[in-house]
């Protein structure tokens, strides 16, 4: 009697999900026990989120940062299924896709990613723009082109949240809009980039000042209208005209994850063990934005792309170990520093004893992210384009 091939189902094709699938495909399963690996995502493309900002300034093209899953998974043995998850039966580990097939699996990986909460103030759902997905970038690009084509005197942009995303967006948009832009950064606390190294925070402050970005600290958003934003500063309400409001504050877990009968924290994140297994469910793994994860030392980890990237290696190994009778490894996070883009051809980085800003940091950031691209083939294509594009531009001119 032949033994049925085990199946691993990975829900979500972001850093956590895709990189787990790719790593699993490389691990040495015994031939008779080699599992079927299924990756499910509602989109047809992976998105290298840290480089999404470069689309706004035409520094990068869509294919470079958002290659199709089918291209990335070619010859890996991983099966890609595009669809929206509409139901997960935890007890039987069965996954139902909207207008799609149903999967039963032996190991389930939850890596569905987070969402931007737009329901925190009145009017945000209707009028604010989020910036997390390729669709978000296209929607913002369409609005920018419309405003640029109108030849208005000024294009007024308010960005809510002076964390990493808010600061990076402010610098890119200020560079794109130039003299026409009036970019405002709104932050509830008394400091921008609170968790950032001091070197990066200083570099960001200088970049924002150079680009004449207004920074409103200790300021709350009261409401957002079709062409206004209402700000509260020390009890005084100001209503300002605005053309675009970008909302970068917060990450929330989708309702599909919140509804699962699994242990969760107050934010709805799934609570995992140091081996990235769901508490009381060793056959289900979770990583990325939807998981509350503590490493081997008990330290609670941030929900960043860098953490998800490293979690993927451990998740893949621990799934392999659980299927082949090997010991599982507790996750050990290695902080590799922090990088931010601060406008066109400008960045800052701090970590591993290195501190850089300006164009040199921009080049180092690009090379670091090129190395992190999902597959060697894609690294080669993108790397060659980065080398050849300046030469092509020079020849055109």
Protein language model features and the residues they cover:
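Short glycine-rich anion-binding loops that position phosphate/pyrophosphate groups of nucleotides
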Residues: 16, 113-116, 251-253
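A Rossmann-like FAD-binding core segment of flavoenzymes
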Residues: 76, 80-87, 175-274, 278-280, ...
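FAD-site-proximal beta/loop scaffold in flavoenzymes
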Residues: 126-153, 239-310, 317
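FAD-binding core/adjacent interface of flavoenzyme oxidoreductases
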Residues: 1-7, 75-158, 232-235, 246
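C-terminal, flexible cofactor-proximal segment of oxidoreductases
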Residues: 311, 316-397
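Beta1-alpha1 glycine-rich phosphate/pyrophosphate-binding loop at the start
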Residues: 2-79, 158, 167-196
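A short alpha-helix-loop-beta-strand transition element characteristic
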Residues: 148-153, 182, 325-333
